[in-house]
């Protein structure tokens, strides 16, 4: 089994292009959460020529809608959202400089093409492990679109956030490649 890769943010294109499907990764640093409602607001703002609340250059976006935090915790359960919900907005957002996305599930061909063009890696966090994932989140702070509730744009400080590369900058798809050996029974 391959060794776990430790990444510290920001995620540069150079580092992103070195990651390959199947790589096990632990991320430490700042990542940003945003789901479909926030993506819709941001792409509409860009269409109007407005500036976004953060500079997305070399950032990682986590498709997350957390549950409320228990007293003393920075966040509640923090499992991934199905990434396909963001696909309509993703090519536009990748043009803003995002270099990593964290979610679950397959992506559209338009997203895969944009990932290859912009040097972006797609990571999967394990669905169903939301409470465990939350333990790697040390701070959660809403920075824009507070009216969207759990879908607001937020900054997360993470330590050893566990994920796996499921889409690399060459267009490889772990959901397909990982299953291939088991289809020939």
Residue ranges, per PLM feature:
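Short, structured beta-strand/loop micro-motifs enriched in basic residues and often containing a Trp
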Residues: 2-11
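Short, glycine-/Ser/Thr-/acidic-enriched flexible segments
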Residues: 12, 32, 67-69, 170-172
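Feature captures the catalytic cores and cofactor-binding loops of soluble hydro-lyases/lyases
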Residues: 33-161
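Active-site/ligand-binding-proximal alpha/beta "capping" segment
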Residues: 90, 164-185
